[in-house]
Each structure stands twice: as structure tokens, then as C-alpha cells.
Amino acid sequence: MAAPSLVLFRRDLRVADHPALAAAMAAGPTIGVYVLDDTADGRPLGGAARWWLHHALTRLAADLESLGVPLILRRGAQNTVVPALARDVEASGVYWSRRYTPWGVAADKGLKAWASEAGITAQSYAGSYLVEPWAVQTKQGRPFKVFTPFYKAMQAAGEPSLPLPEPEPQEPLLLTVKSDTLADWALLPTQPDWASGLRQTWQFSAGERTADFLDTAVNA
């Protein structure tokens, strides 16, 4: 079997319209990775964010499994966890969607530097916005502060790329490396269980409400 690639998931917990996942699976066997770094941006996740993360990762794991892609969960600092995992699975490359916060950019630059030294591929992709933040700027090369000029500049930039479909499934990978479980992370509230009503209004319900809004409010 060819050496696998790692795809790092952060906030982009989906399989459709995911350029990094599509590129990795086109290159060969692929392993999904999510690293829970509690203080990466200087503060721990709040209760609602932890609840969302639990259910988003549950859905992501199921969606990846349908594509033959395992999802490995690890806790710790990204730039410590990922190199160790890459060595364990003898990865040939690491793929991810770009981040734009100062700490995210710095961490990902460090990851690319490690990959270069290790002699493996490191590829980042635009997977979060319609356009990169620096692609639409004022004539002075600065971010817009007023909506109307920004809107006109976006219109002049042309149509954005169409969303990518889900990749074609690969042959399922059987791994022996260790993965945390969501139960290990204890992300869900217990006492009080304030999230009980949210469990009935997850992605499917959101899709129904969006379709209803488009039919009644937009197309009316």
C-alpha cells in the first residue's frame, strides 16, 4: 500500500466542498485527523462549543467512514501531535484548510517548516471563505472597512468557484495506531443537561428550516 496522507480537520468538519480532503484522496490513501488543542487560541472552548464539537465530530467520523477514511482523534498541541502521528503511520503528506488568525497562521507555518525538514508534502488550501481575505482589497492594498465598496469589488471579482462534491470512496484503511474517543474528551454537559433540546435540532432540522425560508421568504 502507498504511504498515506493526513488531512487535518479544524473548523471545516465536513467531507463535501473540502479542497484539502479532495486533493489528499486524489493523491492516494488518506487518514483524517482532528487535534483537540484546548488553549490554541489562548482560551478553552466554552460549553456550547464543546457540545457542537462532539456532534460535529460524530457526524464527520461517519461521513469519512463512508469514504473509507478513518478519523484519528488526538489531544494536545497540533505541532507536537501531528509530527508524531505522521511518523507512526509513515505519512507521505499533510493537507489542511488555511487559517487566518495570527496564532493559526503561525502554527501552520511551523507545521510546514517541520514537513519540509521531514521531507514530506505539506499543502494548504482555501477552504473557509468564498475568496481569500487578501484577494479583495482597496486600491491601497488594505482591507475594506465600508460595505458598499467591498460589495462592488466582490461583484467585479466574478463568480466564486462552485462547491466541490464529496470525493469518491477509497479502499478502507485498517489502522493500528491509537485514537482517542469522544467519550475520553467528555465534551457533553451532564449536570445540568442544558443541551437536551438541541439534540433534536441538529443539521437535518437546520436544512429543513433553510429550505422553508428560501421557499417562503425568498421565493415568495
Give the positions of each predicted feature.
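Trp/Phe/Arg-rich N-terminal binding region typifying the photolyase-homology
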Residues: M1-P160
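Glycine/tryptophan-enriched, flexible segments
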Residues: R142-A220
